[in-house]
């Protein structure tokens, strides 16, 4: 991972008190450290909802579930396009880079406790309009990822029931289940359920990974005669296919912008770095090991999502075990968007933490609206890889690469003309920003091209389609 220069954003005096930062606060309420006043979004010891109750261990589990989720169902197909070496380097590289930028965001949050989301942070640079623009981007990103989750859950329902009813009906049930979980108000309470979700999802994935090593050939491969597994250390995909595959790997660990609201609810926000590093290491190791095993035994004969590759029985078992984890994991993404909008509407009012009608009406109304939007998007583009790729390109590349680099450069603007070492550090973050722009533009173009091809070829036959979506095969 890159050099730990992000840690220098936050400096402590001998008493452990945080020194005042150098950022221009713009329209975001400032912090007067000298007077001991803070502008934390959620206050402690209030007559109402206590939000700041999350331990670093529980935060770690939330971070794990944010990042280790639907992507494990899409990454093996990405390795099929990139090869084992190319895919492995992408997983290691993106995990390291996303952890590093996550540490930058955490340090900015510690230096500016009034920031509840990435939108508030960008308001430090761009003012009110920048904050609102990034806020809209957060809603779009979380809606796209939630929609991808709804698609994954409908696949699970179809697999378990042998397509027992119209897929649109399963989509509606999925959106309702996700919204019910998302409507739990605090990350602390979500944390207990997240433990269950994370464990069940990992067990489901592990069952599938073991099962796929025991079959003679992948379910999608020809069932008689010789066939070419298609495994390769290095593959040579087209630019469009390669970019979508790279974007799907990138999105697997780029959830660090979702960590920021969790920091606002931690008992000890200074423990964030510990939680971020532990979660990043575990998630990267699981993605790398599980994906390599799946690709080794399936090659290019991968179903999308991957659970179908081991046959119908294993697919049912894996989905049956992991479905609670899928629902809970997707609910966290919607919860982050809902919490942003909720705080945006009620910030600095008595209704933010008081159990009033306005509090509950706003919270539930926002969750229902977001769940409805995710359902509509899921039925309009019902392929998981494309939804994740779209979210990664237009939203998560800025969130995890461009914006953290800009925040670092704004904090250390003097490095631009400083010593040679300082100039190198500044240039490194300029490169991160430029790479983020490349991911955003090239990724968006590639995903749009593939979505158009999917409609043209009938892979996506129509919107709000009742057809079974649990057996789509990607391969030769």
Curated annotation (Swiss-Prot):
Induction: Expression is induced in response to 2-benzoxasolinone (BOA) exposure. Expression is also induced in response to 6-methoxy-2-benzoxazolinone (MBOA) and 2-aminophenol (2-AP) treatment. It is found in: Membrane. PANTHER family: AMINO ACID TRANSPORTER, AMINO ACID TRANSPORTER (EUROFUNG). This is Transmembrane transporter FPSE_08127. The keyword Transmembrane applies. Keywords: Glycoprotein, Membrane, Transmembrane, Transmembrane helix, Transport. Belongs to the amino acid/polyamine transporter 2 family. Transmembrane transporter; part of the Fusarium detoxification of benzoxazolinone cluster involved in the degradation of benzoxazolinones produced by the host plant. Maize, wheat, and rye produce the 2 benzoxazinone phytoanticipins 2,4-dihy-droxy-7-methoxy-1,4-benzoxazin-3-one (DIMBOA) and 2,4-dihydroxy-1,4-benzoxazin-3-one (DIBOA) that, due to their inherent instability once released, spontaneously degrade to the more stable corresponding benzoxazolinones, 6-methoxy-2-benzoxazolinone (MBOA) and 2-benzoxazolinone (BOA), respectively. The chain crosses the membrane at residues 72-92, 133-153, 164-184, 192-212, 231-251, 275-295, 317-337, 364-384, 387-407, 431-451. InterPro entries: AA_transpt_TM. GO terms for cellular component: membrane. It comes from Fusarium pseudograminearum (strain CS3096). It comes from the Eukaryota.
């Amino acid at each position: 991972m890159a050099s730990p220069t992000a840690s220098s954003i936050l400096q402590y005096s001998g008493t452990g008190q945080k020194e005042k930062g150098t950022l221009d606060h713009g329209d975001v309420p400032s912090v007067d450290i000298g007077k001991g006043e803070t502008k934390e979004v959620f206050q402690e010891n209030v007559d109402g909802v206590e939000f700041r109750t999350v331990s670093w261990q529980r935060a770690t589990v939330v971070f794990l579930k944010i990042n280790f989720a639907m992507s494990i169902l899409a990454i093996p197909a990405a390795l099929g396009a990139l090869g084992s070496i190319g895919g492995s380097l992408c997983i290691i590289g993106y995990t390291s880079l996303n952890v590093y930028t996550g540490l930058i965001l955490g340090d900015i949050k510690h230096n500016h406790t009034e920031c509840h989301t990435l939108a508030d942070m960008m308001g430090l640079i761009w003012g009110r309009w920048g904050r609102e623009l990034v806020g809209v981007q957060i809603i779009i990103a979380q809606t796209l990822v939630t929609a991808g989750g709804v698609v994954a859950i409908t696949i699970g329902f179809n697999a378990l029931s042998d397509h027992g009813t119209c897929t649109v009906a399963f989509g509606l049930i999925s959106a309702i289940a996700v919204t019910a979980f998302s409507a739990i108000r605090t990350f602390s309470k979500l944390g207990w359920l997240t433990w269950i979700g994370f464990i069940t999802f990992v067990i489901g994935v592990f069952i599938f990974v073991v099962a796929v090593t025991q079959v003679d050939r992948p379910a999608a491969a020809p069932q008689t005669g010789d066939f070419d597994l298609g495994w390769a250390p290095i593959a040579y995909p087209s630019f469009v296919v390669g970019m979508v595959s790279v974007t799907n790997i990138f999105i697997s660990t780029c959830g660090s912008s979702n960590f920021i609201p969790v920091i606002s609810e931690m008992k000890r926000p200074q423990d964030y770095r510990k939680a971020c590093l532990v979660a990043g290491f575990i998630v990267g190791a699981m993605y790398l090991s599980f994906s390599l095993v799946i690709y080794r035994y399936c090659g290019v004969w991968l179903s999308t999502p991957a659970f179908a590759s081991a046959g119908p029985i294993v697919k049912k078992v894996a989905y049956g075990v992991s479905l609670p984890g899928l629902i809970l994991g997707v609910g966290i993404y919607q919860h982050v968007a809902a919490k942003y909008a909720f705080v945006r509407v009620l910030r600095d009012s008595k209704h933010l933490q008081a159990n009033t009608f306005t509090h509950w009406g706003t919270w539930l109304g926002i969750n229902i609206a977001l769940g409805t939007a995710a359902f509509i998007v899921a039925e309009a583009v019902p392929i998981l890889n494309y939804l994740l790729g779209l979210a990664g390109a237009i939203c998560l590349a800025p969130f995890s690469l461009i914006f953290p680099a800009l925040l670092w450069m704004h904090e250390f603007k003097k490095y631009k003309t400083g010593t040679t070492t300082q100039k190198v550090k500044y240039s490194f973050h300029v490169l991160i920003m430029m790479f983020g722009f490349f991911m955003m533009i090239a990724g968006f173009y590639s995903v749009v091209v593939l979505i158009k091809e999917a409609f043209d070829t009938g892979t996506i036959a129509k919107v709000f389609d009742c057809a079974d979506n649990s057996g789509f095969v990607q391969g030769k």
